[in-house]
UniProtKB/Swiss-Prot annotation:
Full protein name: Protein OPG137
Native organism: Vaccinia virus (strain Copenhagen) (VACV)
Free-text description of this protein's post-translational modifications in UniProt: Phosphorylated by a OPG054-independent mechanism.
Induction details: Expressed in the late phase of the viral replicative cycle.
InterPro entries, per database record: Poxvirus_A11 (IPR007755)
Record text on subunit structure and interactions: Homomultimer. Interacts with OPG160.
Matching Pfam families: Pox_A11
Primary site of residence: host cell
Keywords: Coiled coil, Host cytoplasm, Late protein, Phosphoprotein
Job description of the protein: Required for viral crescent formation early during virus morphogenesis.
Encoding gene, per UniProt annotation: OPG137
The keyword Nucleotide-binding belongs to this UniProt entry's keyword annotation: no
Lineage, highest ranks first: Viruses, Varidnaviria, Bamfordvirae, Nucleocytoviricota, Pokkesviricetes
Coiled coil: 145-172
Family: Belongs to the orthopoxvirus OPG137 family.
Length: 318
């Protein structure tokens, strides 16, 4: 393919070319459409130039003048000079402004070349002979500017930094809220954070790995509903514990009475029946009985029954 030197590139076109006769532009490419257009224009200019060189209008006009207007040495009359019966047809296209402009541009473009000298350190690029002012001497590679892997890595690093900043900020806020709760300076915020801490504590008691940061995705309404549900379950559990303690005390008394009557086989019954077994077997029934009897979450009653249960297990009442 004929080399097509490019003298000027518009800003809206691609500024990347192949490395044909461009030793410093190894990363540049040209589109197929642009290459086909440049090739077509170059071929047209070459054909017109070759046609103009073979038979120029000046040669044809000089030949016609020599034949039609004889010299002084020729005979006096034109009749004496025998002319061949030929017809001269000038099929060369007349010189036009566009054709002359293309020829002159091609001649100028062939004379203009970049002599680029690259230093040993590849830092300085000097332009020795150039009359083209619109093309930059060094064009940055778009592949380096828009490196996909590098951009993804930078975005990932930025996300990690933002997460670290967010976690540090939230940790300081949680610590500040905890100190305010401890010293009772802000009742509203202490109540709000107490709900979250109560939820986390309840989850930890049940073996669930939940933290305060995990509750940040929940709205305040959701926190309120979760806290109310836990509170209702906690009150129900307290009522069941009260009924369970009463059942354990009654079983211990019955066991001692049966042992007093001579039933040795009943020994060890109280140790087999625990609070967990009662909760699994008749836990819901205990809650229903407590609700029907109107037994509420009474801390005093719960403490008294707990102490009484311990003493009944150790002391023989009957």
């Amino acid at each position: 393919m004929t080399t097509v030197p490019v003298t000027d590139i518009q800003n809206d076109l691609i500024t990347e070319f192949s490395e044909d006769n461009y030793p410093s532009n190894k990363n540049y490419e040209i589109t197929l459409r642009q290459m086909s257009i440049l090739t077509h224009v170059n071929n047209v200019v070459d054909r017109e130039h070759n046609a103009a060189v073979v038979s120029s209008p000046e040669e044809i006009s000089s030949q016609l003048n020599e034949d039609l207007f004889p010299d002084d040495d020729s005979p006096a009359t034109i009749i004496e000079r025998v002319q061949p019966h030929t017809t001269i047809i000038d099929d060369t296209p007349p010189p036009t402004f566009r054709r002359e402009l293309l020829i002159s541009e091609q001649r100028q473009q062939r004379e203009k070349r970049f002599n680029i000298t690259v230093s040993k350190n590849a830092e300085a690029i000097m332009e020795s002979r150039s009359m083209i002012s619109s093309m930059p001497t060094q064009t940055p590679s778009l592949g380096v500017v828009y490196d996909k892997d590098k951009r993804i890595q930078m975005l990932e690093d930025e996300v990690v930094n933002l997460r670290n900043q967010r976690s540090n900020t939230k940790s300081s806020d949680n610590l500040d809220n905890f100190t305010r709760i401890l010293f009772g300076k802000t009742p509203y915020k202490s109540t709000e954070v107490n709900k979250r801490i109560a939820i986390v504590n309840y989850a930890n008691l049940n073996g669930s790995p939940l933290s305060v940061e995990d509750l940040d995705v929940c709205s305040e309404d959701e926190i309120d509903r979760i806290y109310k549900t836990i509170k209702q379950y906690h009150e129900s559990r307290k009522r069941k514990i009260i009924v369970t303690n009463v059942i354990i005390i009654v079983i211990n008394i019955i066991e001692q009475a049966l042992l007093k009557l001579g039933f040795e086989e009943i020994k060890g019954l109280s140790t087999d029946i625990t609070s967990e077994i009662i909760d699994v077997e008749i836990g819901d029934d205990c809650d229903a009985v407590a609700s029907k009897l109107g037994i509420g979450n009474s801390p005093v009653l719960n403490i008294v029954l707990f102490i009484l249960k311990i003493f009944v297990k150790r002391i023989k009442i009957i």
